């Protein structure tokens, strides 16, 4: 079944109309993707085998339960818990709605792309909804030794945009401060696209001298200049059939911006010293931390090039905007450090761990250098943590002082730290009410705290 096919009208799948539900499920079984049928009261009426295999739990029957209980462990619908509810939006628009959520699964929390479509009766009334669920492989909501990692609302917004644009050929412009993970996002975009089997070629626009830029990008013919003893393909040619990632495109010299624009507009290029126009075949992804619009006003960046690369901009959040993600990222980075040590021949390499005080300190810091700064801090701390435990004294003194100032400024005597609440919420298997009782606060206070942390209350 194609995701854009119109779902045929069927009799209302009431709880007492099992033959109709079974007929709909038989239709859904043709789809290899996990799918469920949900009634207007959020109750799961049926699920296909693909859903049971991927999201089912042995001994637990999902049919008959509310979808928000199964997927989120909520005791209220998503929109009442501070989340975007695709069912509510689909009812208002009377059409397909799509959203990226974090669902509880047998493997732990996972990013899931939810596509929901209403089913109408002969009178035009919505009688049920069909949900198609696709696990997002390009990012992890759990600690991971590779790839994108995150669970905060700001991160999920960027990931959701990435998932939507990945199947297309639109040029993508990643916008964000230094250290926010632009290359990781670009690579994830490539791997989620139809060109995933092709090359992913990175062009560091800030690291190539202006005099070498053209030959590096387009290559050169034998004899094109002194020292050109043989033909050399450029990075554009190397990216054939794949993705060309222009990192820090704001650093491209003005004379080269003209040639880059011609490449994008015509889809052709010439090697330096060559006369033959060669056909380019790549998906363009660019990134910058610079204010390109201001650079256009100052005459430092071409407006026509800007509109070519800015077809689908994706703002990437700074780490300080990803409340609740510091602990997740820290554990992921520590795993990567351990893996690197093991690969280097350290047979006893194992993941380092952070004390609660150290984690609270990291969580309170503003991280002007973003994830890159967090990685540097942890790599340094690992060199001092002889027993594998990173304590607050292993962190840079200026970071500890800055964190203390921020914590004092918050005037917060809440008992449970943000870092501790994030950790508990992400491992808690129960309702929000039960979690509130465990951490000793009201459910309303818990909701407000989790919302401020960027969790959107979805972790329970």
PLM regions and their residue ranges:
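Bacterial C-terminal helix-turn-helix
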Residues: 1-19, 47, 52-55, 104, ...
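Nucleotide-binding/hydrolysis machinery
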Residues: 57, 195-198, 273-283, 291-403, ...
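Terminal output helix/cap of sensory domains in signal transduction proteins
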Residues: 60, 65-108
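Compact sensory input modules in signal-transduction proteins
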Residues: 101, 114-116
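Conserved post-Walker A coupling segment in P-loop NTPases
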Residues: 161-227, 237-253, 318-324, 377
């Amino acid at each position: 079944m194609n995701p854009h096919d119109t779902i045929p009208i069927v009799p209302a799948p009431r709880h007492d109309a099992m033959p109709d539900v079974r007929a709909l499920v038989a239709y859904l079984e043709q789809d290899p993707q996990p799918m469920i049928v949900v009634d207007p009261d959020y109750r799961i009426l049926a699920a296909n085998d693909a859903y049971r295999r991927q999201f089912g739990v042995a001994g637990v029957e999902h049919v008959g339960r509310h979808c928000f209980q199964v997927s989120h462990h909520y005791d209220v619908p998503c929109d009442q818990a501070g989340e975007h509810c695709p069912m509510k939006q689909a009812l208002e628009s009377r059409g397909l709605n799509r959203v990226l959520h974090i669902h509880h699964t047998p493997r732990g929390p996972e990013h899931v792309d939810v596509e929901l479509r209403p089913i109408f009766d002969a009178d035009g009334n919505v009688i049920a909804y069909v949900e198609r669920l696709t696990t997002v492989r390009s990012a992890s909501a759990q600690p991971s030794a590779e790839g994108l990692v995150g669970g905060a609302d700001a991160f999920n917004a960027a990931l959701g945009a990435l998932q939507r644009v990945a199947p297309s050929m639109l040029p993508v412009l990643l916008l964000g401060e230094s250290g926010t993970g632009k290359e990781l996002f670009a690579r994830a975009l490539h791997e989620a696209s139809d060109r995933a089997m092709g090359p992913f070629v990175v062009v560091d626009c800030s690291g190539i001298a202006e005099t070498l830029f053209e030959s590096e990008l387009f290559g050169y013919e034998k004899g094109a200049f002194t020292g050109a003893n043989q033909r050399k393909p450029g990075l554009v040619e190397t990216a054939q059939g794949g993705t060309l990632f222009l990192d820090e495109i704001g650093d491209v010299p003005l004379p080269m911006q003209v040639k880059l624009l011609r490449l994008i507009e015509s889809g052709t290029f010439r090697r330096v010293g060559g006369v033959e126009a060669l056909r380019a075949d790549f998906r363009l992804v660019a990134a910058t931390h610079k204010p390109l619009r201001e650079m256009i006003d100052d005459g430092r960046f071409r407006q026509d090039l800007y509109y070519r690369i800015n077809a689908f901009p994706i703002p990437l959040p700074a780490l300080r905007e990803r409340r609740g993600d510091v602990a997740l990222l820290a554990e992921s980075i520590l795993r990567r450090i351990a893996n690197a040590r093991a690969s280097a021949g350290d047979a006893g390499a194992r993941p380092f761990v952070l004390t609660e005080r150290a984690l609270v300190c990291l969580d309170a810091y503003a991280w002007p250098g973003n994830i890159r700064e967090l990685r540097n801090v942890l790599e340094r701390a690992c060199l001092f943590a002889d027993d594998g435990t990173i304590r607050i004294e292993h962190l840079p003194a200026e970071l500890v002082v800055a964190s203390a100032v921020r914590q004092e400024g918050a005037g917060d005597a809440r008992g449970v730290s943000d870092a501790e609440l994030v950790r508990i919420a992400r491992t808690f298997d129960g309702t929000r009410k039960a979690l509130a009782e465990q951490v000793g606060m009201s459910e309303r206070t818990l909701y407000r705290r989790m919302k401020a942390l960027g969790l959107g209350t979805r972790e329970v």
